[in-house]
Amino acid sequence: MTNIRKTHPLLKIINSSFVDLPAPSSLSSWWNFGSLLGVCLGVQILTGLFLAMHYTSDTATAFNSVTHICRDVNYGWLLRYLHANGASMFFICLYLHVGRGLYYGSYTYSETWNIGILLLFAVMATAFMGYVLPWGQMSFWGATVITNLLSAIPYIGTDLVQWIWGGFSVDKATLTRFFAFHFLLPFIVAALVMVHLLFLHETGSNNPTGIPSDPDMIPFHPYYTIKDILGFLVMLTALSALVLFSPDLLGDPDNYIPANPLNTPPHIKPEWYFLFAYAILRSIPNKLGGVLALVASILILAIIPILHTSKQRSMMFRPLSQYLFWLLVATLFTLTWIGGQPVEHPYIIIGQTASILYFLIILVFMPTISIMENYLLKW
């Protein structure tokens, strides 16, 4: 008798995706982050759903409703901090996942890669709108500053900003629509994840060597299911430690002050996971130029498959490219640090240098070094 998981219309899909899926035998722990992102999304949707039951998206009561969740709702504090720090964990996994794709050349699967970029934008939009909801000082001023960037778009900019605000400033209408979109977007993200996996399973997974692994495949279950579960345990332990021991470590103390349109905080900055892009934005002393650089800093991922000039897919056997990759990582850490610093000497020049270096590494150095490595292979 044929096994039900191979014949049942629904179970058949799950079986071919998570049980009998052929996977390369050499996948390292860097391939764990896809499933970890799935867990993060699940945690965020669940905690967010329960938070939405108690939250009110009105400027008069939003801040108090978050306080009420933390003080009066059973385990409300746990839900709130799991959701806030879960977002940080989400972005850690997301950046490591993208980094893995860059290092091992996974971007040559162009459909999977492009949907991944769409997912990155969707998650960033969701996180930004979520940060506005507690209606603290940094929520309000962060929303004001970031939405105001759209006014740099020629001709339609000002009208566009007022249309997004639903008025002449960030106010009740803005908060209500941000809550609506923040609730909706994770489900769109979940749908995009399905498409991401659909395209991935068309080609099969890449592997650390970058060499086709068709002759050497193993079933996903039990090998990688067990490996993924270990990853879940490690990540959830780290998240629990963060939530239970220092829940405000990654937050901004200004967000414990209710939003006040008449009082600007001394340093307006987004959450840590946006600081690298914020540093690039600030490093250009022109509004439109800064906005274009900000968008380009992420959209640049879309042209990476075109910039791949190496004859090898992975960086595993390319020491010069590896050096450049880690220089890029160091540059991103520098930008993240600069994004949290005030706009003054020497931070301005460090930020500008790091921003130029970021684009140079991706657009110029990496393709050039790859061509050099191709010649070195002939020797």
From Swiss-Prot:
GO molecular function ontology, one term from the record: ubiquinol-cytochrome-c reductase activity
A Pfam family that the UniProt record links to this protein: Cytochrom_B_C
Database matches in InterPro entries: Cyt_b/b6_C, Cyt_b/b6_C_sf, Cyt_b/b6_N, Cytb/b6-like_sf, Cytochrome_b, Cytochrome_b_C_euk/bac, Cytochrome_b_N_euk/bac, Di-haem_cyt_TM
Transmembrane segments: 33-53, 77-98, 113-133, 178-198, 226-246, 288-308, 320-340, 347-367
Textual note on the cofactor: Binds 2 heme b groups non-covalently.
Cofactor(s) needed for function: heme b
Residues annotated to bind a ubiquinone: 201
Other comment: Heme 1 (or BL or b562) is low-potential and absorbs at about 562 nm, and heme 2 (or BH or b566) is high-potential and absorbs at about 566 nm.
Subunit annotation: The cytochrome bc1 complex contains 11 subunits: 3 respiratory subunits (MT-CYB, CYC1 and UQCRFS1), 2 core proteins (UQCRC1 and UQCRC2) and 6 low-molecular weight proteins (UQCRH/QCR6, UQCRB/QCR7, UQCRQ/QCR8, UQCR10/QCR9, UQCR11/QCR10 and a cleavage product of UQCRFS1). This cytochrome bc1 complex then forms a dimer.
Protein name: Cytochrome b
